[in-house]
């Protein structure tokens, strides 16, 4: 009886595990968390430097996946990161995503991004220019705090929520 029950449970769960497979992969120096079920990929932590261009799609295990988010701490303290190009498939920038990226000087947030999570660009002391495209809805607490070189920022009318201390410590 136990063998039949175990076999029955295995038959039920096996299709679920293959259908929702999640994995990590590094492609062209960028690390991704991939969910093939939803055909999505999230940029995750790696020791990035220089100019980084995130593609809109990646191929993983024969599946085309859209890069839809920049994960929590994806570029955490990547002090040698000088520029980032974010594709129009990204809808969110995670918590602490670019915290401490001191060599990053400018960033353009594409119109596909709806939310910039808290502390996303905290203490990016070299950041001078931020362009937020129309489409962004929410800028969470402390998103740009500590960016003491920030001299220009464009915030579109689409932004309906700006959290606390978003520009704290900016000159």
Task: Walk through the language-model features, giving the residues of each.
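Structural signature of tandem-repeat unit edges
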Residues: 29, 47-69, 79-92, 102-115, ...
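Consensus positions within tandem repeat domains that build extended binding/scaffold surfaces
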Residues: 72-74, 94-99, 117-122, 140-145, ...
């Amino acid at each position: 009886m136990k063998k039949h029950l175990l076999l029955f449970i295995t038959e039920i769960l096996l299709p679920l595990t293959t259908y929702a497979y999640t994995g990590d992969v590094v492609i062209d120096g960028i690390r991704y968390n991939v969910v093939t079920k939803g055909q999505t990929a999230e940029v995750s932590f790696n020791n990035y430097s220089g100019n980084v261009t995130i593609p809109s799609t990646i191929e993983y295990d024969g599946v085309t996946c859209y890069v839809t988010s920049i994960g929590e701490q994806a570029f955490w303290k990547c002090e040698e990161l000088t520029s980032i190009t974010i594709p129009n498939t990204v809808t969110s920038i995670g918590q602490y995503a670019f915290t401490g990226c001191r060599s990053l000087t400018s960033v353009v947030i594409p119109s596909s991004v709806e939310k910039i999570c808290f502390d996303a660009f905290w203490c990016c002391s070299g950041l001078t220019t931020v362009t937020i495209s129309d489409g962004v809805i929410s800028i969470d607490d402390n998103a740009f705090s500590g960016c003491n070189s920030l001299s220009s920022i464009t915030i579109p009318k689409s932004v309906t929520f700006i959290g606390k201390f978003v520009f704290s410590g900016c000159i």
